[in-house]
Amino acid sequence: TMLDKQFLFPVFNADSFGRITAYKNVGEAINDLTDKGEEVPNHIALNHSDIVVRRYELIPEGGKLPKPEFLPEDIRRKNFGNTYTRLSRNEVSSTIVPGNNALPVHPTLNRSLTPREAARIQTFPDDYIFMGDRRSQCIQVGNAVPPLMAAKLAHCVDMYIDGIEYDGIQPDQSFYVNTDNDFSGIQSKAKRATLKFGDLFSGAGGFTRGLEQAGLECVLGAEWNDYAVEAYRKNFGHECLQIDLSTEENQELVAKRLKDAHVDLVVGGPPCQGFSIFGNRRFVNTKS
């Protein structure tokens, strides 16, 4: 932040926010989907091979695949033999990551989670639609900012900008920048209807969903992936630019659009580091 005060992050709680439902554990989030099929949007099960299913059968609820020496020889893995994990219905989920076969194993079924089950855990409602084939849907869900987290952050941002005192925490690595810029143009809550924001590297729109539920108004999204843009446009009525933000020309274009719209803040989930296995944009060597 460039305001002359420290931003405090939300205090942890497991409460729902507005129309975004919080679940206390995996079972509460997805148990009702166990007997349902593809009539539920994005509820598409992966067709695992017989070998993979046999491995899954050996994983206890809340546990991992046994070490290779304890497995039948024909289903042992040469690498990453202990990375298969099965969720527990009575615990919170491990982090949802992107990838067609990257989702954790269902608590009771011998398959990985469906995109919809993963989206439930990420706090997306069932009417929030992800686009493309199953692999693309898994990537969109795994890359998404959970709307519930975004909403609680946005609530703190709103109070922070309005100068309202609130309970919050200061992470060890947080900081603020004190500048000589003039922020007198930021209107008080009494003078504006709501905070306006732009969502860069928006993906399928988890950040936007959460911030809008907190009462903020998105004026522009920006994303380069075909299916993510399609999903964003499916779920929101405002404009989403399909644009590569690695070029200076496009950066200036988006900056002008946001300035013209008089946004109060910019949010975004930038891509992983260039050297990451998930990083498709390797135009910068972030190691150095």
Question: What is each PLM-predicted segment?
Answer:
Residues 28, 151-155, 159, 166, ...:
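A broad, structural surface signal
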Residues 26, 92, 236:
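Residues that flank catalytic or metal-binding motifs in active/ligand-binding sites
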Residues 33-193:
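C-terminal target-recognition/interaction regions appended to catalytic cores
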Residues 183-288:
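Core alpha/beta nucleotide-donor-binding catalytic domains of modification enzymes
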Residues 9, 146, 269-270:
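Hydrophobic alpha-helix-in-membranes signature
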Residues 22, 149, 224:
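Soluble or luminal CAZymes and related metallo-dependent hydrolases
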Residues 1-78, 253-260, 278-288:
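Class I S-adenosyl-L-methionine
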